[in-house]
């Protein structure tokens, strides 16, 4: 007996077959291959887990989606993690759609030539973007951001279409 006001959105997704169908439909305009852990490249996955590789028509920067006990999206150096629940699945679909449409890119920070981390930046960044403001909007974790703005380094943006990729040098503040 379900109370009428039960919020269906927080329901666990019990098995991923409906999700797989829904996702394949959402990705129907893309070149997608489906993989299981019976393949050597995917033998780290659990039984029953499925991986979708969305082929990038421009280069080898493919997008990887893994569906298992939780859902994962990999693009460039970014790894997005989503719980296997409806509202998080919807968030994942929005993120994937934004990447494929070029409306989101992977923002990576480097200081001293070392990678400090990556995040998904939900915007198309212009070549003359204000880096401090961009990092305010897109970078949640304080520490590497402060270090970058103080010591200098670089910000890389990776998009589905490599023609949109950007690299910004940040001069040290001394």
What would you call each of these model-derived segments?
Residues 1-4, 174:
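Short intrinsically disordered terminal tails
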Residues 4-53:
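N-terminal "first-domain core" detector
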Residues 10-14, 18, 83, 87, ...:
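Alpha-helix boundary/N-cap detector
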Residues 26-33, 37, 102, 126-128, ...:
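Surface-exposed polar/charged interaction patches
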Residues 40-44, 59-66, 105-112:
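Short linear motifs in intrinsically disordered
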Residues 43-55, 73-76, 117-122:
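Generic recognition of long tandem-repeat/solenoid scaffolds
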Residues 55-91, 132-174:
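Intrinsically disordered, low-complexity regulatory segments enriched in Ser/Thr/Pro
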Residues 86-142:
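Amphipathic protein-protein interaction modules
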């Amino acid at each position: 007996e379900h109370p009428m006001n039960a919020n269906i959105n927080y329901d666990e997704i019990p098995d991923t077959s409906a999700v797989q169908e829904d996702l394949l439909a959402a990705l129907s305009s893309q070149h997608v291959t489906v993989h299981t852990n019976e393949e050597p490249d995917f033998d780290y996955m659990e039984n029953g887990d499925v991986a979708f590789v969305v082929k990038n028509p421009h280069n080898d920067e493919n997008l990887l989606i893994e569906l298992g006990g939780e859902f994962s999206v990999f693009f460039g150096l970014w790894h997005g993690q989503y719980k296997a629940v409806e509202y998080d699945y919807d968030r994942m679909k929005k993120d994937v759609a934004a990447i494929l449409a070029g409306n989101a890119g992977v923002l990576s920070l480097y200081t001293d030539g070392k990678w400090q981390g990556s995040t998904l930046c939900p915007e198309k960044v212009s070549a003359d973007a204000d880096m401090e403001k961009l990092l305010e909007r897109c970078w949640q974790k304080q520490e590497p951001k402060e270090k970058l703005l103080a010591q200098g380094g670089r910000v890389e943006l990776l998009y589905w279409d490599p023609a949109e990729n950007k690299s910004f040098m940040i001069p040290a503040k001394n």
